[in-house]
């Protein structure tokens, strides 16, 4: 399965092609014409700050989360998965929001697609929180990412990781707990990155029955909000 999560818009040696910076800025401005005015629904009668997936609206992003700022938004697109019944394609929406607190809200849902790209059935779903914490393996380091997820398939997963660059992040499962009705899964490794065109791309590998990491999910999602 292809990824793209580790790529960027630079050429060989990290040098931008002539004019590519101007084109990237122009493309970003054009995209923002559609996405900048959108946000996620919110109840306006609650006494707490509303969740926002648009950095132009709502509470200011907590300073502790600045290294995760590019993730905030609503992302939609398609990807490829590998399951017990073989490879498949899926559609996906990821909502990354905040309320000014020291964490990001994360909600991802996907749906399987037919060979012609039509909706087939519900897919994977997860919800949780991103935050920065003291590195559990190095108390003097404060740039460890903690991602806590609850999966609709019946398990809870704790990831730790680090920023790889200003726009890419790598995480690995540290702990996993399964409910009595939950599916049996192994730990995972995830890589997220903002790639050329401003899209969010990621790859996930999971430990199989033989104890090795194997490709599980990959997708490239375009910004819909923010």
Swiss-Prot record:
Residues noted as binding heme b in the record, renumbered to the chain: 189, 216
Swiss-Prot/TrEMBL cofactor(s): heme b
Modification N-acetylserine occurs at: 2
Sequence motif GXWXGXG, location on chain: 73-79
Entry note about domains: Forms a 10-stranded antiparallel beta-barrel structure able to accommodate a hydrophobic ligand in its interior. In fact, this fold hosts the heme group, which is located in a wide surface cleft.
Function: Heme-binding protein able to scavenge peroxynitrite and to protect free L-tyrosine against peroxynitrite-mediated nitration, by acting as a peroxynitrite isomerase that converts peroxynitrite to nitrate. Therefore, this protein likely plays a role in peroxynitrite sensing and in the detoxification of reactive nitrogen and oxygen species (RNS and ROS, respectively). Is able to bind nitric oxide (NO) in vitro, but may act as a sensor of peroxynitrite levels in vivo.
Annotated protein name in UniProt: Peroxynitrite isomerase 2
Source organism of the structure: Mycobacterium tuberculosis (strain ATCC 25618 / H37Rv)
Source taxonomy: Bacteria, Bacillati, Actinomycetota, Actinomycetes, Mycobacteriales
């Amino acid at each position: 399965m292809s990824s793209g999560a580790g790529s960027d818009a630079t050429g060989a040696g990290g040098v931008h092609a002539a004019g590519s910076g101007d084109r990237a800025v122009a493309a970003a401005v054009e995209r923002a014409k559609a996405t900048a005015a959108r946000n996620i629904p919110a109840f306006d009668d609650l006494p707490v700050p509303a969740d926002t997936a648009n950095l132009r609206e709502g509470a200011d992003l907590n300073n502790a989360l600045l290294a995760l700022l590019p993730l905030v938004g609503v992302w939609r697109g398609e990807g490829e998965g590998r399951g017990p019944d073989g490879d498949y394609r899926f559609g996906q929406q990821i909502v990354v929001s905040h309320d000014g607190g020291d964490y990001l809200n994360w909600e991802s849902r996907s749906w399987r697609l037919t060979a012609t790209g039509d909706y087939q059935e519900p897919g994977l779903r997860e919800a949780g929180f991103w935050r920065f914490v003291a590195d559990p393996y190095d108390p003097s380091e404060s740039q460890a990412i903690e991602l806590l997820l609850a999966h609709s398939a019946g398990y809870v997963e704790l990831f730790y990781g680090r920023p790889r660059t200003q726009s890419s992040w790598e995480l690995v499962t540290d702990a996993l707990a399964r409910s009595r009705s939950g599916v049996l899964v192994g730990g995972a490794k995830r890589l997220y990155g903002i790639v050329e065109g401003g899209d969010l791309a990621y790859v996930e590998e999971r430990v199989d029955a033989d104890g090795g990491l194997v490709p599980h999910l990959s997708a490239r999602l375009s910004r819909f909000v923010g």
